[in-house]
């Protein structure tokens, strides 16, 4: 079979509308499956793919297709399964081009089992293997809402956690939720089914009013059916990232557990999923970590004879890595050209560039995408004999390392942006696929000259909420989470500017930090960090930060370096930015707190011991992504906090009867604020008086909440425009979406209402 590099799929009827309600075309579907290939393939590779096709659109009849048609392209991987009624040959989708073929077939849905094919020793014949994961399909009965599904999902997660298994949630794209659990050791499909059934039955016993494990539909009204049967070797489940053939183009979308706590949880559309992937990557990355990887050197080997050419021809499959070397080789072949190669995932991704990379931004040069080369080729120089592929002399013209801004080298949506650091050539380059294997190479302006890094437009990178206990120090660095205000700082040879997380210039609000200008007078830097006020124990205090005066000692604790003396560092790995930051601190009086010791669990314990707010874990290889909340940064706090928007207030009783007694809290949603309860605990008399003064000009007769408030909460309320952001502590979210046992922490003038999301 041909390698993925040789495969070609021609899209026909590109403008055919497959989702009439949204006008989504076949071309849109083609682009979607090309866009999700990198994250989806690991979850379907090695598994037989059953397709559900809507050739005439979702408003017309569909049909399931298991048997691979004789007209299918020969390069598609395939294997045969014996059924009672005969044998069926299934396609195995293990390449981006295979997914493109799926789209060309208008096979909107891809269904796979929980087992993979395994090769028989000796013969190499593929046969069904053991299950590598569990799946639970949470199917809502009549009247069941998403919040109830999420409640059951958390119960399943907790049961599996008791036996040492981790669970990942997926909104199905239809009505329900899917839960996936990777198995440390594969088990038979029968064994997986037995385990899943026991979990479902145990859940039914614990939650009889909400859960059923029985397939009888008449028993499902008002309950969640925990379908365990899809672990059977003969059954399939809609694959993660697959489209659904419904009225709208929804997707079986991986979610975070924090999202399942959101009462507004809903199914996601394909365009939303693409945005999430660009921001967060694959949320199911740990589900199929052992997925089979295609040998990317198959085509390279087939084009060469080791007995006739001095080129390196390794026999082993390449091992995926995170190296970042590049090489440009001058190739005196029949048509002289330069070969540009970038190390990626264990191979050298390669282009033949007739005129070499351009040396200015005003021209584009043609680049032909060629077969992947082995890493050993990066040091190859020599003469390829006449009559052999690529005959001619090869000389290394330049080599070095590169930073990645974007790397999509698939045959359909290719775009690569890198920053080269070589001896003869340096700078930012983009390679963009135009048609087939034809790409354009373009030199970009240096990132420091781009608008994206203008300090006034820079937004801080944000962390996702999660647990750090299972994270290892070999891959993650652990910082303390400080109880202060996030600041971006620009110090430029004696001048300093400060910006809040929301983008406000707050230089005048922190006269105590003017000393940074003198400390960093020899440099032009942009720093990310936290402004803190320490209590008598030397611990950052949020309340003292809130009530600081001009004479209060405010410190700036830096934890990231984004720009240094003419070089933008956004595309540089965290561990390298950290080294530069520590070097800068050693040469100045800049405060850079030390990293926490050990793995995640030890770091979290250290943070608790010192009375800090929590821990921020950062992948050592992560790049800085301005304004994005990314899974490569994880925050884990010792107590629950939530930012809220104030939507109204109620007068107090007794000594508070003339002023504010409690505040109405909300979380911004599409139709207004989603009511999150009231808070009065923790407010001092001084704060109450200040709040009354601040809220007076915001008075409105219209409720800012998306639905009418319950009578007990609406009584005696004065509504205000949703302009002020505050932070509260709480014990838990109730099923109704209220904060239980909330207590006031303070206003957050550094935050905009539009930034507030449910944690």
Swiss-Prot record:
Outcome, altering residue 16 to A: Loss of DNA-binding, no polymerase activity, no effect of gap-filling (in Pol domain)
UniProt-annotated stretches for the region 3-phosphoesterase domain (PE): 297-446
Activation and inhibition: The polymerase, exonuclease and ligase activities are stimulated by Ku. Polymerase activity is inhibited by EDTA.
Binding-site positions, Mn(2+) 3: 331, 337, 339
Residues binding substrate: 52, 111, 137-139, 172-178, 230, 236, 244
EC number(s) given by UniProt: 6.5.1.1
Region (Not required for ligase activity): 1-411
One GO BP: DNA replication, synthesis of primer
Disulfide bonds: none
Outcome of substituting residue 217 to A: Better than wild-type DNA-binding and filling on single nt gaps, impaired gap filling on more complicated templates (in Pol domain)
Biased composition (Basic and acidic residues): 747-759
Other comment: LigD has variable architecture; domain order can be permutated, domains can be independently encoded, while some bacteria lack the 3'-phosphoesterase domain entirely.
Family that this chain belongs to: In the N-terminal section; belongs to the LigD polymerase family. In the central section; belongs to the LigD 3'-phosphoesterase family.
Domain notes: The N-terminal Mn(2+)-dependent polymerase/primase domain (Pol) functions as an independent domain, binds DNA, is sufficient for DNA-directed and non-DNA-directed DNA synthesis and interacts with Ku.
Oligomeric form and interacting partners: Monomer. Component of the NHEJ repair enzyme with mKu. Interacts with Ku in the absence of DSB via the Pol domain. In structures of the Pol domain with template DNA 2 Pol domains are bound to microhomologous DNA complexes to form an end-bridging complex. Probably interacts with Mycobacterium phage Omega and Corndog Ku homologs (AC Q853W0, AC Q856K7). Interacts with Sir2; may form a trimeric complex with LigD during NHEJ.
Name of the protein: Multifunctional non-homologous end joining DNA repair protein LigD
Species per Swiss-Prot/TrEMBL record: Mycobacterium tuberculosis (strain ATCC 25618 / H37Rv)
